[in-house]
Amino acid sequence: MKLYIGSDHAGFEMKEALKDWMVKEFPSIQIQDKGCPSAESCDYADYAHAVAESLNNDSRGILLCGSANGVSIAANKHAGVRAALCWTEEIATLARQHNDANILSIPARFVTLQVAEAMVRTFFNTPFEGGRHAKRVEKIDL
C-alpha cells in the first residue's frame, strides 16, 4: 500500500514524528510526503489538495493541521475522497468500518503523538465493513 501524507505548519512536527514511527511500524507501506517542508507558516489547502489528488484505490492518506478542519474540508472537495477528522482511536475505527475513510485527518494541536499513532495503526488495520454501510458510502459522491 502507498500512503500520502501532508500537513501545514501546525502539523509539521507531528507529521515528521509519524513518518519516522510508520517506517518502523509498517515497513511494507510506501510513504510519500506531499509537504509542507518545514514549520514555516503555509496554507493547509495546498497540501490537502496534493494528498487528495494523489489517492487511488490502492492508497490512503494522512493529513494534519491544527484542528484538522481545514485539511478535511479541502480534501473532501475531491471526488472519491472520504477524509475523516478523528481525535480518538474509536472514531478512527468507525471512520474505517462505517465510512471507508481513505484519509485520516489529525488535529495536531489537540491530540498527543501517542493518540495519533494509535489512530494511524487503527486506520491501517481496520477494514471497511461493507454491507449496509456500502450503500451509504455510495451516496456520498455527487
Model-derived features: positions:
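C-terminal binding/interaction regions
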Residues: Y4-G6, A10-E13, E89-L142
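Short, solvent-exposed amphipathic alpha-helices that sit
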Residues: E13-K24
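A short beta-strand-loop structural module common to alpha/beta enzyme folds
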Residues: I29-S41
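Mid-chain, well-packed structural core segment of small domains
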Residues: L63-R109
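Short active-site oxyanion
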Residues: K2-L3, D58-G61, G80-R82
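Conserved beta-strand termini and adjacent loop/short-helix elements that scaffold enzyme active sites
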Residues: G6, K34-C36, C86
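Short, structured active-site "lid" loops
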Residues: D46-S67
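Short glycine-/acidic-enriched loop or helix-start segments at secondary-structure transitions
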Residues: K15-E16, S72-A74, V115-A116
